[in-house]
A protein has these predicted regions:
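Cationic, low-complexity basic patches in intrinsically disordered or flexible, solvent-exposed regions
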Residues: 2
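Membrane-embedded transmembrane alpha-helical bundles that form the catalytic cores
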Residues: 6-224, 228, 234
Length: 234
């Protein structure tokens, strides 16, 4: 089982190192500002994964107001409600069902467990992101959104544009594009996507379950039509 905090910090800090390697002029010479970025607690637990160039200008040019503070508190409370009330309740339900003996399962119980777990992971993860965005706003920072109603997606491609957006953008910028993106033909493009989802699975957990999970999502991404295909068929 991975450490969520450690994995978030690892790829976030690595993005800074890679960006500085690509462009040495963006190095932060002020140690306090760099440590503020590295240790800024709202984003430590579960994102959003903030790249340094997204927050650098805000460090010395933050603006605070009663309106922003109120919005931040409201957003934090919304995230806390998601986590404590919805995620914990559905998580308890899912754990109780998954703890049953196989002989105690039936079609309905299995589906209730699957749906409960599906709701738990969304409200848990998005709740933490809401709390992070809210706390950041209280301190005068603006974080990008991390979830955009992923369960209303029209397909797996649309889903990954809505789910943990900052993670998808990170892998796009630091893995997919450096591998060649879509510039070297369709086969290479799909191969690069498969590598991205393999690494995404490993990021979620260093065991074969998540490796297989990543490969399945990579295969689904390859075989699924895009939202534009849905629109064209209407």
């Amino acid at each position: 089982q991975r450490s969520l905090v450690g994995s978030e910090m690892c790829i976030r800090d690595r993005s800074y190192v890679i960006d500085v390697y690509r462009n040495p002029e963006m190095v932060q010479k002020n140690l306090f500002n760099l440590m503020l970025y590295v240790s800024f607690f709202p984003q430590l637990i579960a994102g959003p994964i903030i790249r340094y160039n997204e927050i650098a200008k805000q460090i010395n040019n933050r603006t605070s107001s009663i309106e922003k503070t109120t919005e931040g508190i409201s957003r934090f409370i919304r995230g806390l409600t998601k986590k404590l009330i919805i995620a914990n309740a559905t998580g308890y339900m899912a754990d109780s069902i998954f703890a049953l003996k196989i002989t105690d399962y039936n079609f309905l119980v299995a589906w209730v467990g699957a749906i409960a777990y599906t709701l738990q992971i969304y409200y848990d993860f998005s709740g933490y992101s809401d709390m992070a965005i809210g706390m950041a706003k209280i301190f005068g920072f603006e974080f990008n959104e991390n979830f955009n109603h992923p369960y209303s997606a029209k397909g797996i491609k649309d889903f990954w544009r809505r789910w943990h957006i900052s993670l998808s953008l990170w892998f796009r910028e630091y893995v997919y594009i450096p591998l060649g993106g879509n510039r070297k033909g369709k086969f290479r493009c799909e191969f690069n996507k498969m590598i991205v989802f393999l690494l995404t699975g490993i990021w979620h957990g260093a065991n074969w379950t998540f490796v297989i999970w990543g490969l399945i999502h990579g295969c689904l991404l390859y075989t699924s039509p895009s939202p534009r295909d849905y629109a064209a068929s209407r």
